[in-house]
């Protein structure tokens, strides 16, 4: 099972305040633990929403909104993508994580859909296309 672990943004992360050297060392050690355990697939920190944009869809219309975005608690400041055997294991990995922000912070855990989750609508042709695209994307990495 794959899970996305999303570090929620804070006022500090949205202000562009970078982590301390100590925090970078702690996160580096945690990431090394994840990699050595064979569970980490990806992980990155994100720039503040002031450097981002959103595209709103309404039928065929597209509206672009530049950041920053107001609801800091709903924003993501970073993420990991991990592969583990259960949600409980994902929770245990998150509990071992150093606090990613000074003060209070939150990491949201969400399971990633797998091919079998889509049922009969996910035809053999669509599966083949997905596998081909994943292989091409891996080559691009």
Question: Model-found features: residue ranges?
Answer:
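Conserved, structured core segments of small domains
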Residues: 1-141
């Amino acid at each position: 099972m794959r899970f996305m672990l999303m570090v929620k943004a804070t006022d500090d992360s949205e202000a562009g305040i970078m982590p301390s050297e100590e925090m970078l060392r702690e996160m580096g050690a945690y990431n090394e633990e994840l990699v050595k355990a064979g569970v980490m697939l990806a992980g990155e920190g994100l720039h503040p929403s002031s450097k981002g944009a959103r595209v709103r869809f309404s039928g065929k219309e597209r509206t672009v909104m530049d950041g920053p975005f107001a609801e800091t608690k709903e924003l993501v400041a970073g993420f990991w993508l991990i592969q583990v055997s259960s949600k409980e294991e994902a929770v245990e990995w998150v509990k071992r994580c150093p606090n990613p922000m000074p003060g209070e912070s939150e990491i949201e855990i969400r399971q990633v859909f797998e091919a079998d989750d889509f049922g009969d609508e996910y035809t053999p042709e669509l599966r083949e296309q997905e596998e081909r695209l994943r292989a091409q994307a891996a080559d691009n990495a």
